[in-house]
């Protein structure tokens, strides 16, 4: 039976520290504030937005939601971004992805002020990570993976890590982050041949495919540490990850659950970044 790596325990510890820091900011009449930009009305985006707002309210972090039409002109979006960048009361800016196809992703990401880029979307902030500098904002999901491993005293040094994702949201930045911790990294993707033969040799497997219960027990060895980043809906309408949790947990060394795993830490780190930004700009 695997050790279950609960993310909500990690999140709770981070929030305890945030409460103290937010109280100190209040003494200076500073209230941390996040601007959320959502284009369109996709149910997943609305649900995510509500969860962020709820989490912010619990810590007395203010939010400002900009609900935008999916067909918004790029120039109008950039004008709004410029306004938010210049608004002193706004400490962090989060733009929901993916963007409508008519918008240039690089231009949108580059329009976010570097000091308000709380999910590390700006190319210059990402470049810093690729250069091995982990001192500023990091993408929240990859950072959540690192924080959970750190909380449970799982040392990355010398470990063989397989990441099943090659996106700029998870796979690529995470690969650079674990490299900075002296791990050896393999990135796999949809074109990888014989994926189980690769993952089975790994010490740590991180999966972010987005396919419910696709990853079965034959992908792992008895000592595997499994980090399931995805949040999917299974055949019964329940939340699940990429990994067939109930079967795999009997065969590996440790595993994150879904829910109460990586996702809970991801949102908490977003809150931490907002507070970080408020402190830096105070």
UniProtKB/Swiss-Prot annotation:
UniProt xrefs under Pfam families: THF_DHG_CYH, THF_DHG_CYH_C
GO-annotated cellular components: cytosol
EC number from the UniProt entry: 1.5.1.5, 3.5.4.9
Gene3D superfamilies to which the protein is assigned, alphabetical: Leucine Dehydrogenase, chain A, domain 1, NAD(P)-binding Rossmann-like Domain
Catalytic function, reaction form: (6R)-5,10-methylene-5,6,7,8-tetrahydrofolate + NADP(+) = (6R)-5,10-methenyltetrahydrofolate + NADPH; (6R)-5,10-methenyltetrahydrofolate + H2O = (6R)-10-formyltetrahydrofolate + H(+)
This protein's pathway: One-carbon metabolism; tetrahydrofolate interconversion
Domain of life where this protein originates: Bacteria
SUPFAM superfamilies: Aminoacid dehydrogenase-like, N-terminal domain, NAD(P)-binding Rossmann-fold domains
GO molecular function: methenyltetrahydrofolate cyclohydrolase activity; methylenetetrahydrofolate dehydrogenase (NADP+) activity
GO biological process assignments: L-histidine biosynthetic process; methionine biosynthetic process; purine nucleotide biosynthetic process; tetrahydrofolate interconversion
Keywords (A to Z) from UniProt: Amino-acid biosynthesis, Histidine biosynthesis, Hydrolase, Methionine biosynthesis, Multifunctional enzyme, NADP, One-carbon metabolism, Oxidoreductase, Purine biosynthesis
Entry keyword annotation includes NADP: yes
Record InterPro entries: Aminoacid_DH-like_N_sf (IPR046346), NAD(P)-bd_dom_sf (IPR036291), THF_DH/CycHdrlase (IPR000672), THF_DH/CycHdrlase_cat_dom (IPR020630), THF_DH/CycHdrlase_NAD-bd_dom (IPR020631)
Residues bound to NADP(+): 165-167, 190, 231
Disulphide bridges: none
Complex and partners: Homodimer.
Functional note: Catalyzes the oxidation of 5,10-methylenetetrahydrofolate to 5,10-methenyltetrahydrofolate and then the hydrolysis of 5,10-methenyltetrahydrofolate to 10-formyltetrahydrofolate.
Similarity annotation: Belongs to the tetrahydrofolate dehydrogenase/cyclohydrolase family.
Record's protein name: Bifunctional protein FolD
Native source organism of the sequence: Clostridium botulinum (strain Hall / ATCC 3502 / NCTC 13319 / Type A)
Lineage: Bacteria, Bacillati, Bacillota, Clostridia, Eubacteriales
């Amino acid at each position: 039976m695997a050790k279950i790596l609960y993310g909500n325990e990690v999140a709770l510890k981070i929030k305890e520290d945030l409460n103290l820091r937010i109280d100190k900011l209040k003494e200076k009449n500073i209230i941390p504030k996040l601007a959320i930009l959502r284009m369109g009305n996709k149910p997943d985006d609305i649900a995510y937005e509500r969860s962020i707002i709820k989490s912010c309210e619990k810590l007395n972090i203010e939010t400002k939601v900009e609900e935008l039409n999916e067909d918004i002109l790029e120039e109008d979006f950039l004008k709004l971004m410029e306004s938010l960048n210049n608004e002193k009361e706004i400490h962090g800016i989060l733009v929901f992805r993916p963007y409508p196809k008519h918008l240039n992703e690089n231009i949108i990401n580059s329009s976010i002020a570097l000091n308000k880029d709380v999910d590390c979307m700006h190319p210059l902030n990402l470049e810093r990570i690729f250069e091995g500098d982990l001192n500023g904002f990091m993408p929240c999901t990859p950072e959540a993976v690192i924080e959970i491993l750190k909380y449970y005293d799982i040392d990355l040094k010398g470990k063989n890590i397989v990441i099943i994702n090659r996106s700029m949201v998870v796979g690529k930045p995470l690969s650079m982050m674990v490299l900075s911790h002296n791990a050896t990294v393999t990135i796999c993707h949809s074109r990888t041949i014989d994926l189980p033969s690769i993952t089975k040799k790994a010490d740590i497997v991180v999966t972010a495919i987005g396919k419910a219960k696709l990853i079965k027990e034959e992908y792992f060895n008895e000592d595997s540490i499994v980090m399931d980043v995805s949040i999917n809906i299974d055949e019964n309408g329940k939340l699940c990850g990429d990994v067939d949790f109930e079967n795999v947990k009997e065969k590996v060394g440790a595993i994150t659950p879904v829910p109460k795993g990586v996702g809970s830490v991801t949102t908490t780190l977003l809150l931490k970044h907002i507070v970080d930004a408020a402190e830096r700009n105070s």
